[in-house]
Amino acid sequence: MHFAESVQTPPPSRPSDQSLNQHVLDLGSWDQGCRDLMLVNWLCVDFRQRLLNVLYTSCQKNFNEARSLARERLLDLVQRIASSDNLHGALYTPPSLDSRSSATPPQNLPPTPDLVQCIRGCDEPFPPLSLPTPAQIDTQENERLMCTPEDITYHDRDSQVVAQARRRSPPGTGPAVLPPIAFDNHELPPGCSDFLNFDLLSDGEVFSIGTHAGVTSDVCDSMPLDHDLSEMELDPPPDATTTTTTTTVSSPNVHSTHHLAIPNPEPGTPTPPSPLAGTSLTRKPPGTPDSPSAASQRRQRQRRAAAHATYRSTPSPCQSADTHIGAENEVAEPAPPSPSTRWTHSIPTHLPSPDTVLATFTHHLGRGKQSIALLLTRLFYAIGSPDALSQLRDAVKLSREQTPAIIPVSSTNDLATTVKALDHLDSMTTLSHILRRYYLVRLLEHRTRFEQDHVTAKQAWRPPKRMLKYDCARVELIKNGGNCSSSSCSSSASKKNEEKREPPLKYRSKSQALADLMQMLYPDLKPAVAEGKDCVYSRKLTKLRNRLSCARNWYRFEQAFPGAILALIPCAGRFSVSIDQIEKLPSDTVQIFLDYLQEHRGVFSRCVSQTLGTGIFSVLARTSADAAPTFAFEKVEEEGFGDLLYDTDELVSLSIEYDRYCDLNSNA
C-alpha cells in the first residue's frame, strides 16, 4: 500500500514494533490534515498486523475456523465504526490520493481516541494521544509564515489533491486501505470488498497457519491492488532531493523484508518515523515516469490479483454420476513402478509390444488396477520364455541329485561356498514352487471329485419334476395282462421306496466335500462343539481352504493349456513375477488373461506344454523308479538362453527329449 507524504518533514523514525506509541503519535510539527493522514496510515497497517497475528496465534483446528473468527472480529469492528456515536466528530475520511486537483478544501478534524482504541482492539490498553498545545500551534503558524513560495505552492497542490481524492471515495466508505463504513458485507462497493476478502489468506500466499515461520513473502504484493492505489504518489518540490533507504523490519507475525523510501531531511529537521511493515512512501519529481522496477512490480501485483480472482470465479468441473460412483468404488492404488524392459529386445515382431499389452489389460481392468495390469503384462511374456526354461533347467538338475543338500559341505566359510549355497537355495525355491503348483491342482481335483459325487447323490434323491403317464411298473403290468387295480399296488410300492430313501443333505456340495476331505486327512480330529472356538481342527480346516483357494488359478492354467504349463511359469527372475500375486488374482481377471494369451500366444504355449508333457513332473517329483528322460534344454549353458527368441521353433525343439533332439539335428 502506498501513501503520500506530507509537506513537512515527519518526526524522527522509530522501530516498527513500537508503532502507535506516544512518540509515534506525537505529530505536533505537522498540520492537521497530514497528521490525520499519517495516523490513518499507521492504524491501517497496525490493524493488518493484528489481523495476521490473530490468524497466526489462533488455536483453532483448521484455517477455516481461524478465518471465520477473524471475519467475526472484523465485522464487529466495522459495525462499531459505522455507529453514529463513533462517527460523530471522528477522524475524517482520508482519500485515495492522485494527481488531480479540486477546489474543495480538506476538513481538518481532530483524531478521536475512542476510534483509535476501537481499531487497536480491546485486548490492549491504548496510550493517550498527544495533541498539539496552543503554544505548539502558534509555533507551527509562525513556521508556515516563513515557508518559501515553492513550499506554499506545493502545500496548495497537496491540499487540492487531498480534497479531490476525498470526493472520489465511494459514499459510505473509507479509503481503500480502511474497512468500509457498512456492516452488511454484501452491500460493499467493489473496491472495498477486497479488505474483507479472506480467500487470499487461505490460498497460502499471504498467511498460512503452521507454515508461517520461516517463509518469506511480501504481504502487500500478494493482496489485490486497486488502480487508484497504484497511483497514490505525489510530486516533491523541484529542489527536493530523494534518496532511497532500505530498511529491514522484523516482526513476530510477518517475516519479510520491506523497502522504505525516505527523503533525505534537511539539517535540523526531524526525520519521519518508520511506518509499520508493508508500508511504502515514495516521492519523485513531477513528470517523472515510473521506474522499470516499480512498474514491473505493479504489473506483477495486478496479474497476481487477477489470477486470484480468476481462480475463485472458475467453477470446478462436475463429474457425471456414473463417473463419480465408479471413482468411489475403485480403490486408489499408488503409482506402480515401470516393469523392467531388458527382455524386450528378444520379442519377435509377430507378438504385440509391451505397451500394447499393457494398454489392453488396463482397458479391461480399469485405471484403478494399474499394478495388476503391469503384473499381467510381465506374465504374458514370462510364460514359456527363455528365462522360464533356464529356471526349469536348474530345478531339473537339482531334482536329479539323489540326496540334494541344502548347503554344500565345506569346512571353511569362504565366499565361493556362500554364493554356491545361495544358488542352491534359489534352485530349491524354483523346484518347490513348481511342485507346489502341481500338488495344489491335484488337491483341487480331489475336492472337485467329492463335490461332484454329492451333486450326483442329490440329483438321484430328488423326484423328477414331471411324472410320466405310464411309468415302468405300470407298463410291465399292462404287458403281463394285469388290470387297473394293479396300478394302486404299484403306487403303494413306490411310496414305500420313497420312505426308504435317505433324507436330503443339509449342506452344500462344496461344504460337504470339504468335510469329507477333513475326515479322510485327519480322521482323529473332530470339530469343536462351540462355533468360533480355536482348536486344531479349525486351524487345519482354514489351512485347507487357503490351499484350495490358491489352487483355483493354477487349475485354470492347467485346463487352458494341458501338459506342462505349470512348469513353464518362472518364479521372480527378471520378469519379477510373484507367485503369491498370481494366486490372489480374481477369477475374472485370470480369465481375461487366459483369453488374451490364447489369442496371441496360444499356439506356441500349447505346443511347448504338450511337448514337455507329464514327463517333466515325473523328473521333478522323482515319482518314477525307471530312468527319467533327459530333455534337450538340460544341455544348454546358462548363457545360451539369452540368445533365444520368444515363440520360435528352437524353443519348442529344446522341450523334447535329448535323444530325439540329437536325431533331429543329425538328420537335418
From Swiss-Prot:
Residues 495-505 have a biased composition (Basic and acidic residues). This is Echinocandin B biosynthetic cluster protein J. Pathway: Antifungal biosynthesis. Residues 1-20, 92-113, 224-322, 330-349, 483-506 are annotated as: Disordered. Part of the gene cluster that mediates the biosynthesis of echinocandin B, a fungal lipidated cyclic hexapeptide that acts as an antifungal agent. Linoleoyl-AMP, produced by the fatty-acyl-AMP ligase ecdI, is transferred to the initiation carrier domain (T0) of ecdA. The linoleoyl-S-phosphopantetheinyl-T0 is sequentially extended with L-ornithine, L-threonine, L-proline, L-homotyrosine, L-threonine, and 4R-methyl-L-proline to form the linear hexapeptide. Thereafter, the terminal condensation (C7) performs macrocyclization of the NRPS product and the cyclic scaffold is released from ecdA. It comes from the Eukaryota. Residues 264-275 have a biased composition (Pro residues).
